């Protein structure tokens, strides 16, 4: 799991923090308002549960490129090269498994083009 600070007045704007969550380590990850959230599933199966601070509003949904070099998230077990967009086609996991991203997630722009809080 990864969180990226989108608060434009923050000293940590554009910085990321990540943690591996698993059934074994039983960790949870609290992501405050003003941060983007992303995750990479490293197993064949996963159960993903989350809680938010308000009701879902489709018009409030946003996103950013998961592989933006300006942020430089170090995704675990990932091999590949940035090709100028959020497409997963040039990336695999270390075991050769292809990434599976939704069409929506492959179209997000980088940090500089993302909304700020």
Report the location of each language-model feature:
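Non-catalytic, conserved peripheral segments adjacent to functional cores
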Residues: 1-27, 40-45, 52-117
